[in-house]
């Protein structure tokens, strides 16, 4: 039996953000020092400081599950804790 070596490739953060942008994936952003609110929308641009232009942005209150549509915004990178693909709405 031959031994195959599986090589794992590290994914750079900028590449993952770019993939979200290219595929128009709806993402959720966790805010720094604000656990009660999150932002959901589509990344349409970003820079080397992780400043993000967000389209169709919604503010989600995690306590009440209420949503507030805020449209297109520029979110400064210092405010971002985590970016991930948003759960599909039923």
Curated annotation (Swiss-Prot):
What InterPro entries does this protein map onto?
LSM_dom_sf, Sm, Sm_dom_euk/arc, snRNP-E
Keyword Cytoplasm present in the record's keywords: the answer is yes
The listed locations are: Nucleus; Cytoplasm, Cytosol
Q: State the similarity comment.
A: Belongs to the snRNP Sm proteins family.
Q: Give a Pfam family name.
A: LSM
Q: Which UniProt keywords apply?
A: Cytoplasm, mRNA processing, mRNA splicing, Nucleus, Ribonucleoprotein, RNA-binding, Spliceosome
Q: Which GO terms describe its biological process?
A: spliceosomal snRNP assembly
Q: Which CDD domains match?
A: Sm_E
- The reply to whether Cell membrane figures as a keyword in the UniProt entry is no
Q: May I have one GO cellular component term?
A: U1 snRNP
Domain named Sm: residues: 14-89
Q: Which GO terms describe its molecular function?
A: RNA binding
Q: Which PROSITE patterns match?
A: SM
Chief localisation class: nucleus
What interactions and quaternary structure are annotated? Core component of the spliceosomal U1, U2, U4 and U5 small nuclear ribonucleoproteins (snRNPs), the building blocks of the spliceosome.
Q: What functional role does this protein have?
A: Plays a role in pre-mRNA splicing as a core component of the spliceosomal U1, U2, U4 and U5 small nuclear ribonucleoproteins (snRNPs), the building blocks of the spliceosome.
Name of the featured protein: Probable small nuclear ribonucleoprotein E
């Amino acid at each position: 039996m031959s031994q195959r070596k599986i090589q794992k490739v590290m994914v750079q953060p900028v590449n993952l953000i770019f993939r979200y942008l290219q595929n128009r994936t709806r993402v959720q952003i966790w805010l720094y020092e604000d656990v009660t609110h999150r932002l959901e929308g589509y990344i349409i641009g970003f820079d080397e400081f992780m400043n993000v232009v967000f389209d169709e942005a919604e503010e989600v209150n995690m306590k009440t599950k209420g949503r507030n549509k805020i449209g297109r915004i520029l979110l400064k990178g210092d405010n971002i804790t985590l970016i991930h693909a948003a759960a599909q709405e039923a």
